[in-house]
Regions:
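Gly/charged, well-structured mid-domain segments that form the phosphate/adenylate-handling core
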Residues: 93, 107-110, 145-181, 185
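A short glycine/serine-rich beta->alpha loop
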Residues: 125-133, 179-181
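Short glycine/threonine-rich catalytic loop with a Thr-x-Gly-x-Asp
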Residues: 58-64, 130-141, 167-168
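Extended acidic/charged loop-beta regions that coordinate divalent cations
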Residues: 1, 34-125
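Short, conserved loop/helix-junction motifs that constitute active-site signature segments
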Residues: 14-19, 36-40
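Short, polar loop motifs at secondary-structure junctions
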Residues: 27-31
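A conserved, hydrophobic alpha-helical segment in the catalytic core
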Residues: 83-97, 130-161
Length: 188
C-alpha cells in the first residue's frame, strides 16, 4: 500500500479518468484538498470550522510543509494532526470554505457527540450516535456526499443520530467485570 503520498497520487491519477464526477473533499486536509488542483471536477467541500478538542496532538502531522512550495504551513486552528485552518504563507495555498462545515462542537463523549452543522447555508443541531472526532468529520462528509447523490440534507442529518456501528466498530462488550470498547482502524 505504501506511504500517504503514494496513495494520494494514485487517487489523483484516478480522478483524471472521471472528469464529470463530483469530488467530496475534506477542506481541512492540505493533502486531500490538493486533489482539486488542476481538474475540471466539481467539488463539494466538508470540514470542521473550530477545534474539536481543547488539546490535540500536532506533532503527529502527515503534512507539515506545503504540498506546492514546501514552506511550513501556518494554522488559524487545528482539529487534529495536520487537519484544520491551514495556509501557506509563501504561495497562498489555503483551506477552502466548506459547503458543509461543523461550526460548533457542543459536546464530545465516550458514546456520541453533539455539534452544530452548517450544510449549504442551513444550521442543524446534530447528535452523532458515534464517539470520536473522526466521526465528526465522517458526519460532515456523509451530509456532503448525500447532497451529491441527491439525498436531501434533512434526511441525511436525521440519519446521523440513528446510525449504529457494524460489528467491531466502537462495539461495547464486557470483559470479565470490566467494560471494553473495540475501535477498529485502518491505515494506508
Amino acid at each position: 500500500y505504501g506511504e500517504i503520498t503514494h496513495t494520494l497520487n494514485a487517487i489523483r491519477e484516478g480522478i483524471t479518468h472521471v472528469p464529470d464526477a463530483t469530488l467530496c473533499l475534506n477542506a481541512d486536509c492540505s493533502l486531500t484538498s490538493s486533489l482539486a488542483d488542476d481538474v475540471p471536477n466539481k467539488v463539494v467541500w466538508f470540514g470542521v470550522d473550530v477545534p474539536i478538542y481543547k488539546e490535540t496532538a500536532f506533532e503527529l502531522s502527515d503534512a507539515v510543509y506545503c504540498i506546492h512550495c514546501k514552506t511550513e504551513y501556518e494554522y488559524d486552528y487545528r482539529t487534529y494532526s495536520h487537519l484544520g485552518g491551514f495556509r501557506c504563507p509563501k504561495c497562498g495555498y489555503h483551506r477552502q470554505t466548506p459547503q458543509v462545515g461543523v461550526t460548533q462542537v457542543v459536546r464530545t463523549g465516550a458514546d456520541s457527540s453533539d455539534i452544530v452543522l452548517n450544510a449549504f447555508g442551513h444550521n442543524h443541531d446534530v447528535h452523532i450516535n458515534l464517539p470520536g472526532g473522526y466521526n465528526i468529520y465522517n458526519a460532515a462528509a456523509c451530509v456532503a456526499a448525500a447532497e451529491i447523490v441527491g439525498i436531501d440534507e434533512d434526511t441525511a442529518v436525521d440519519a446521523l443520530s440513528r446510525f449504529e456501528c457494524g460489528f467491531g466498530r466502537a462495539e461495547q462488550f464486557e470483559l470479565g467485570k470490566s467494560k471494553a470498547r473495540m475501535m477498529l482502524v485502518k491505515n494506508p
